[in-house]
Amino acid sequence: MGEESSFNTASAAQVVYIMGFAGAGKSTLAKEFSEFLRDLGYRVVIANLDPGAETLPYKPDYDVRSIVRLADIMRRESLGPNGGLIRATEIIVERISEVIDYLQRLARLNDWLLVDTTGQLELFAFRELGERIVTMLELPSVGVYLVDASMFSKPSDVVMTQLISLAIQYRLGINVITIVNKIDSERIPVRVLMEEFFFKPEDFKQRISGSDLGVLADLAYDLIDSITRYLPPTRVITISALKRTGFDDLYSILHETFCTCGDMT
């Protein structure tokens, strides 16, 4: 306590925390986007922070499963999957200094650090783990909130997605970009809906009034003004991580966000 960190962030990597609900395609994005960045000439490393991952499509440069694995903790402490994941994240927090030390060493030698977070969004974004890592790592950081395009079946889904994105942003204290994945399988024009939400909110309200019904629709309608007050208009980025489509746009908005890091307005 009381000692200043000797870690020099001036030449360290930019950190991208890839977050999202289970099945959003986080690990696929980590793999494919890392290769995209390497093709541009960058030095890129990937950290896996999911203790429950059985297989990964990439070879992690840091793997939290070296500290704890879900299957082991379930067997040892007679826990189910949900309790096991919570207990596993507690163990990671208990050994957080080890995690931070390794990530900082990786960051010293590379341009980008992609962090593939827990399969369950809430374990990283809304519990102690995410906040501790972001705060202690002390590196330029941006969050990517990855959303499966199939989750958008009606206009109010856009509102709820942006509400979650805003909550993550202020919980972790970093800029968060909402990225829509699996756009090749979308059933509705997600980009159109999201652009209307940001740039024509009154038209979007009318769309909700005309198509959505029930309490959730009423709540979404009332939330639009509050969300847009704190979440400024932004370009809508849609990708297919598997096919690497939209990666130029993703790279561009990440670059822009890092250039304005710290501006939460």
Language model features with spans:
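Canonical P-loop GTPase G-domain recognition
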Residues: 172, 184-265
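A contiguous pocket-lining binding segment that forms or flanks enzyme active sites
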Residues: 160-183, 192
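Switch/connector loops and helix/strand junctions flanking conserved nucleotide-binding motifs
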Residues: 55-57, 122-124, 152-156, 185-195, ...
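Helical mechanochemical/support elements of P-loop NTPase systems and associated helical scaffolds
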Residues: 84, 88-99, 122-129, 139, ...
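Conserved beta-strand segments of the P-loop GTPase G domain that flank and frequently precede/overlap
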Residues: 17-19, 48, 114-117, 144-150, ...
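Inter-motif core of Ras-like GTPase G domains
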Residues: 112, 126-152, 167-173, 177
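Nucleotide-state-sensitive switch-loop elements of NTP-binding domains
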Residues: 2-19, 24, 28-132, 138-142
